[in-house]
Each structure stands twice: as structure tokens, then as C-alpha cells.
């Protein structure tokens, strides 16, 4: 994780008078004693090298008469000499200058930021110098002492602040801190905070008021262009040996992106070093070698497609098998099987670290353009356990479910953006409505953090209304859902792109409608008409080549003019 190297200015050598040879001593001519040094006898000046330290981003310097000569960016490397009167004399392009009193020189970049107090604006865990999570959570409003940084960017800003929180040391990203306590404890109000404040904890996922809505820095990543509309084909990892068949479909239709499993619950894409370290059981179940998986992804990229790597986050039976201590358990500490699966608890930071490390490794090994986190939630249908007191989520920090989910995504986005990739999150279709769900997903809070948000409003997952069956009305169902999703988009400061999963399989409910190209077209049009214009992803669990081939007319014509 490092930041940019410290900036430097050009340096010029000091002009030092030449010391003449010492006169020869003779018996008749004793050496002359000199009580005061002169220019001829003064030793050469010893300039030291250091870095400009100041609380500001720049430091001014002056000539002997106090006239301003210019400014230096914090962290600039200079040659300097500390004078007896306390002034700091430096060498610059223009010659000798003197730093203003609010700046000084230190021996290492890590110390260029003077100690001062800041306040936690957004609750986050401290990190180590490599960006890995520490157990200490810095709560909103807490005072920390900034004692330095890990590195500087070219403009003198810190990559991470080195901080002390009540004797516990670590690092924090600067944007999670405020200069005053009042600013730190205030809630960001984009005109809709009162809306969030009125949405309490209805179903056990937490309230909306204590989530974070501060604007996040998003936008194009240099060298990585996300298509404005991702028309995306889903490919299960175990089908990558058929990559040529999927390319044929994409090349002859409007598809311009692929989403490929890195992990999908019990289906593991490849056995990586990170997985071997954290989850050897999962690595042993891998369906591809690293080399074969990478070759398939590279083939998609070489053909000009935007490629997304999908990770199932908090649904991981293999990880629980290897680490039952990180599981959601019964009161006796035994991993609890929920909906047929074992779940690591989303409250645990080791679980977070594993998933983010796995994502970073996937970017480095495979060159994905984006990482998508699916199952980024708590298990659903746990109300009966919670009511009976027969479930333990091991909530070490006293967080709500929604806080844990949003904070995980904040950490993941911070890390992955520095690796040059986008971050997306999958959410249940229910998440588009105006409450915090029981499993901790709240659309405005998640959309504010990630680059793309992908709801899963499959028509056959909606309840029937009398004789009206949503899966028989794909346009109306997705249009109505899309309007709700866009309403949530307007409730957050920096909303994500809305890129939606669509049903690309036959309905699983009576009368078991066949979903052909007309039904796919209807879903896509319903979303677009509702304002959800970021694209779609096809959900077909088997990634059936035959099914996708039959749906090609819905994907539109191949765009030979679009730069993919």
C-alpha cells in the first residue's frame, strides 16, 4: 500500500572558500596563533539532508532581509544547516534561504507532520503501516493525536496519518478525520439526512441514522475505463473451459463485459496463495489451476471486454470449516448452519481482511477491472434465532449489522481503489425500499461507498398479488422496482452506478414461464425506462451457453464502433 514518494526540489552546491596550505614552520619563524576564525581558516560548512516539516501543505522561505523567495511542498528534501540563532538555513534553486518559524527539518518523511489533534469523523479500524486492519476501532467523535504519516503524495498530503488513540498506535486515512470535534460528530446532510434519521431499526438490521453519508471520492480510474452501460454476461468459474463459446456470444451481440466467479460459496475458482493461507479447505476444492484461470481471463481482456471478478463475501462454508472461531454460532460456540450454509460473522475483522486480501490478489494475478462483492450481508431469515436468543453473531464492537456491512465496503473500496480497480456490491431486490433490511443492507449507505450497486430483482422472487404474478410481467416488475431504486439513489451524496442483475433463467414458480429474449428485453427496457441506465448482468447459475445463445437478440447488436 504505499503512497507517492516524497517530492524534491533541485539542489545546488554551496560555494565554499578554498583553505590555503598551512605555511611551513621553521625554528626561527614560530606559527602565528589565530584567536578568531577567518574566511581563510574556517572549515567547510557541513550541510545536512532532511525533509521539510510543517502543519501546512507548504512552507514559505525568505532571504536574509525577510523578503519572500518562494514555497516548498511539505516533505521536500533539502540540504540545510541550523544556525546558532535557531533559524533553519536551506539550499534551494535560488540559493540560500531561511524557513519560516512554523516549519522545520526532520530526518525522515514519516515525521514531516507535526503532532496535533484531530477527531474521528467516520468510525473505522486503525490499520498497520501496510494497510492491514488492527483490532482497535476509532469511534466517531474520538480524539486522536496525529504523530506523522506513512508516506506523502506529491502535493504534500498524507497517504495515511500515523495516529495515537489512547495509547494505541496505528494509521488512518485522512478523510476519516476532522479538524474539530463539532465537525466530527456532525452528520453530513445532503438535504436528506432527516429522511435517514426517521428510518429506525424495524427489522433488526439497525437504523439508518448512524450510517455514513459523507461524499466519497469516485470517478474514472486512470487506465481503467468502466463502460457507461455494462451489458454483462455471467460466467461461473467451472465453465471457463468454454470461454471461446462465451466470446462467440459476446462478439455477435451487444455484450461488452463479463462477470466471472472468484468464489461462489462452495465453488472456488482457483487455489491462490491467499486462499491457501486463510482457507486451505477452499483451496483444495478449487476447480481450476491459477494458470488456466488466468489464461481464460486474459483471453476475455485481450478481446476488449471489461472483466469483473465476483467474490461471495460472508457466505463461506470452507472458511468456517477451517476457522470455526470466526463463525456465527449458537450460544455454546458451535457454528450455526443457516439456510443450509455456514457463515463467517461480518462483524469480524479477520474475515474482512481475508476477503480484501483475496480481492487484491485477484487483481494482481488476473488483472480484473472491477471486484464485485456478493453476499455482502448477514444471513437472512434469522429472526427466530435472534428472538429465542439461540444465535451469537460475536459482535465485538457493538455495531449494527448495517454499520458492519458499510464499514467493510469502505475498507474494501479504500484498498482496491489504490490498486486501480472499481468496487461493486450485490444487494437483494428488497434493498431498494425505504428501510434498513434485517440482514444489514441499506441502499443509500452502500451506494454512497461503492462504484456500482447491483440489485437482484428477479421477477420470480417477488410475491404474487392475488392473481397478478410478477414473473409474468417482467417489464412492469422491473420498472416498478427501478423507480424505487432511483428514489434511493437520490438520498445519498455520491451514488453508485446502478447496474442490475436480471433473470436469465426460466421462472421457478408456477406456471414456470420460459424466459426467452422477449422477457430479457422487457426487463432491460423496464430498468432503462425507470432511470437505471448503468447496464445489466445476466443471472443464470449454470451459465448455460445454449440459454445465452437463445437470448442473444435481447443483448442488442454488436457495436463495432465502441472502444471496449
Where are these regions (language model features)?
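Boundary regions of SH3-family modules and the immediately adjacent low-complexity/disordered segments
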Residues: 16, 43-45, 91-119, 162-221
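Aromatic-lined carbohydrate-binding/catalytic grooves of carbohydrate-active enzymes
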Residues: 253-288, 380-388, 548
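Substrate-binding cleft of secreted/luminal carbohydrate-active enzymes
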Residues: 450-464, 473-479, 484-564
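An active-site-proximal structural segment forming one wall of the substrate-binding cleft
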Residues: 239-243, 248-253, 299, 342-376, ...
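Aromatic-lined carbohydrate-recognition surfaces of secreted/lumenal glycan-active proteins
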Residues: 234, 306-316, 372-379, 399-439, ...
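Active-site-adjacent "subsite" loops/lids of carbohydrate-active enzymes
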Residues: 221-238, 295-298, 309-361
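Catalytic domains of carbohydrate-active enzymes, especially glycoside hydrolases
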Residues: 243-268, 363-370, 452, 527-535
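Beta-loop motif signature
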Residues: 40-86, 119-158, 197
